[in-house]
């Protein structure tokens, strides 16, 4: 599953307020609740699932990228939210650099292959310096989504 298949403009947060990975996860999950991708009553359970995964090993993979993710039986399709932080978020990343782009995604429980495929596609796209630069320079969620669509075709 490609990034453009997961995101809408409403699921892009161009100015994350978070200062650490836990706040970033909360903010992105709150976005998914606000956009109707997660039921309000499931919010805490989804946060717990993502934080459990994040506690086992940071998803700050370097190059200013964080990809918090989890599997849960509370959703029926892959959902996600992308956040951008201009100042950077402490994610305890592998390279000790702050995360500027955080892509949170959730996969339905039991869909291991889809989980791996989605994670690989997101990581591959975000590792492209030109793509990260386009997202960082974009002036709005619309412009960020345009960049996602453009680079996703390449």
Language model features with spans:
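Cytosolic covalent-transfer regions centered on His/Cys nucleophiles
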Residues: 1-154
